[in-house]
């Protein structure tokens, strides 16, 4: 925690610098960042789990307290309007006394609808940053989530401060504990639901605290890219296990995937080949490299694996050009990682918000940035037996290049994905996931 405290001052200074720059350009007095407010379930008296505005938690690790506000102008000490009602129904947030509290001026808000009394008397030149535009309108904000401000902040969010890198390392360390527990639960015969519980216990995080819904998939369920059902019944046969699960630390996310074979067989050999390929792609990461080029290189390497394992036949580059590799690897190589699992700014190529879309041949790629120091990205190649995509391929001449016997052999295993979280440094890569002991 001492290391975080030491880095926090410079983190706030960097955020202040960014705000000062953009509000000067846009002739604004400052930004009013809303933590958010609860969403009530339809026809009920309960709220959905609260998720804080990522722009708010960029400044302060306050994740579970709605109706808070942050006033920043890049010059003065940030002002935190901290919601602390009189409430005998719910737990009221404690007064802030963590290491970060000395870096903000704190005002207490006891009634959410009285916040106007604590806002600047003239907010005509202040911009509201948040989800609840109706609230902003009632309060009199004329400028709400202006495009120029949002693009600027999202573009620069890709460059992580030392405080943020520390948070991301901690998020990886926590998640690795969960992954090791989940692996053990798989080999001990656990159901998907039981494996999930072991993961959550090891990370000491509830399902509403982890940054996304964990994917815990046994056997053919591993072919479903965003599988979150969690079967409670143990399968009769145990072939494979894919887990895509992260952890949260101070609002920063880890996002890690591993795949395991229950026995030594062609699938376990395929996992080894995919792991080797993933490490080769990570070794190619450096400032100045385009993420799109890494994605294309992954398809070229995957094509060779398809041939080596007699899943497909032909020249590897031809398999890429014909879109055959897309059938087995339909998603993107990865994405930016930070305050959000799919962090903002992956398509922005300047601070004005110039958008460069994914290539037409790879529409699901979530990042087209050129790599730079202090960026954090995931690298997550995969190979899957997805019947809906294979059925489309069967409708044309490409079907002759697929060995359907091998496909049938692999179908019960579902698929493979291996995902690490990597920091790009000026002269090296830092694989946080592997450094935390998950191989």
Curated annotation (Swiss-Prot):
Cellular component, GO annotation = cytosol
* One GO process term, biological-process aspect: proteolysis
Query: Which key words are in the record?
Result: Dipeptidase, Hydrolase, Manganese, Metal-binding, Metalloprotease, Protease
CDD domains given for it? Prolidase
UniProt keyword annotation of Manganese present: yes
Q: List residues binding Mn(2+) 2.
A: 244, 255, 419
PROSITE patterns, from UniProt? Answer: PROLINE_PEPTIDASE
Task: Answer yes or no on keyword Manganese.
Answer: yes
Entry cofactors: Mn(2+)
Enzyme Commission number(s)? 3.4.13.9
Q: Which residues bind Mn(2+) 1?
A: 255, 335, 380, 419
Cofactor binding mode, per the note? Answer: Binds 2 manganese ions per subunit.
What this protein catalyses is: Xaa-L-Pro dipeptide + H2O = an L-alpha-amino acid + L-proline
Question: Which InterPro entries does the record cross-reference, listed alphabetically?
Answer: Creatin/AminoP/Spt16_N, Creatinase/aminopeptidase-like, PepQ_N, Pept_M24, Peptidase_M24B_aminopep-P_CS, X-Pro_dipept-like, X_Pro_dipept
Fetch the Gene3D superfamilies from UniProt: Creatinase/methionine aminopeptidase superfamily (3.90.230.10), Creatinase/prolidase N-terminal domain (3.40.350.10)
**Which GO MF terms does the UniProt record name?**
aminopeptidase activity; metal ion binding; metalloexopeptidase activity; phosphoric triester hydrolase activity; proline dipeptidase activity
* Similarity comment: Belongs to the peptidase M24B family. Bacterial-type prolidase subfamily.
General function of this protein: Splits dipeptides with a prolyl residue in the C-terminal position.
- Protein name as catalogued: Xaa-Pro dipeptidase
UniProt organism field: Shewanella woodyi (strain ATCC 51908 / MS32)
